[in-house]
């Protein structure tokens, strides 16, 4: 499990959370 993969996954989760909660 590489840090780069974790970073990308984190950004994806952030974007999903932003889209769902409308808190950007």
From Swiss-Prot:
Expressed by the skin glands. It holds the Pfam family Antimicrobial_1. It is found in: Secreted. It comes from the Eukaryota. Its main location: secreted. Keywords: Amphibian defense peptide, Antibiotic, Antimicrobial, Disulfide bond, Secreted. GO terms for cellular component: extracellular region. One of its GO terms (biological process) is defense response to bacterium. InterPro entries: Antimicrobial_frog_1 (IPR012520). Disulfide bonds join 18-24. Belongs to the frog skin active peptide (FSAP) family. Brevinin subfamily. Antibacterial activity against Gram-negative bacterium E.coli. This is Brevinin-1Sc. It comes from Lithobates sphenocephalus.
């Amino acid at each position: 499990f590489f840090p780069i993969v974790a970073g990308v996954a984190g950004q994806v989760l952030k974007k999903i959370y932003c889209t769902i909660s409308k808190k950007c």
